[in-house]
Amino acid sequence: MDIAIQHPWFKRALGPFYPSRLFDQFFGEGLFEYDLLPFLSSTISPYYRQSLFRTVLDSGISEVRSDRDKFVIFLDVKHFSPEDLTVKVLEDFVEIHGKHNERQDDHGYISREFHRRYRLPSNVDQSALSCSLSADGMLTFSGPKIPSGVDAGHSERAIPVSREEKPSSAPSS
């Protein structure tokens, strides 16, 4: 078995072109050394590698599931309360907007805002859509699918966000 050994100077040749955490969903949670200078760490210490597991944990969760019977969106919004969230259905899209004003945390003052837009499948029953926020900050937007050939009814409407007292059963991958 041959193992190719790559010289450390070439390890991050495309470093500036790799995406960083700066534009991830939870960019407001703080920056790490590798976020600001991702290629510098490998230049100074060629054997230093950031933890891939840490990067996965830092990126948050946004998952869409569409099976035969229902359509579900899981979105990690742990920094927002139901009052900070707006969920609207506009024709074939669901728009989720979260915004909270400046508040104090461990590192000073911070304000956060995000806007997500997802396309709804054409066979989702828009009159039966629901949205809930679990105790651990997982927003679950769901709607049943209807048999093909039946009109799903497209209109603009707001979906209220209800609060659940139990943690989410969404995957934590």
Curated annotation (Swiss-Prot):
Ordered alphabetically, the record's keywords are:
Acetylation, Chaperone, Cytoplasm, Eye lens protein, Glycoprotein, Metal-binding, Methylation, Nucleus, Phosphoprotein, Zinc
Q: Where is the composition biased (Basic and acidic residues)?
A: 153-167
Q: What does this protein do?
A: Contributes to the transparency and refractive index of the lens. Acts as a chaperone, preventing aggregation of various proteins under a wide range of stress conditions. Required for the correct formation of lens intermediate filaments as part of a complex composed of BFSP1, BFSP2 and CRYAA.
Biological process terms in GO annotation: actin filament organization; apoptotic process involved in morphogenesis; embryonic camera-type eye morphogenesis; lens fiber cell morphogenesis; microtubule-based process; mitochondrion organization; negative regulation of apoptotic process; negative regulation of gene expression
Region of interest called Disordered, as start-end residue ranges on this chain? 144-173
In this protein, the residues bearing a glycan are 162
Instruction: Enumerate the residues binding Zn(2+) 1.
Output: 100, 102
Residues modified as Deamidated asparagine: 101, 123
Q: Which residues carry this modification: Deamidated glutamine?
A: 6, 50
State the CDD domains in the record: ACD_alphaA-crystallin_HspB4
Domain (sHSP) spans 52-162
Principal localisation: cytoplasm
Instruction: Quote the cellular component terms of the Gene Ontology held in the record.
Output: cytoplasm; cytosol; nucleoplasm; nucleus; protein-containing complex
Compartments, as annotated in UniProt: Cytoplasm; Nucleus
Q: Which GO terms describe its molecular function?
A: identical protein binding; metal ion binding; structural constituent of eye lens; unfolded protein binding
List the protein's name.
Alpha-crystallin A chain
The annotated subunit structure for this chain is:
Heteromer composed of three CRYAA and one CRYAB subunits. Inter-subunit bridging via zinc ions enhances stability, which is crucial as there is no protein turn over in the lens. Can also form homodimers and homotetramers (dimers of dimers) which serve as the building blocks of homooligomers. Within homooligomers, the zinc-binding motif is created from residues of 3 different molecules. His-100 and Glu-102 from one molecule are ligands of the zinc ion, and His-107 and His-154 residues from additional molecules complete the site with tetrahedral coordination geometry.
Q: Which family does it belong to?
A: Belongs to the small heat shock protein (HSP20) family.
Which annotated residues bind Zn(2+) 3? 154
Instruction: Show the segment(s) annotated as Required for complex formation with BFSP1 and BFSP2.
Output: 1-63
InterPro entries, alphabetized: A-crystallin/Hsp20_dom, Alpha-crystallin/HSP_16, Alpha-crystallin/sHSP_animal, Alpha-crystallin_N, HSP20-like_chaperone
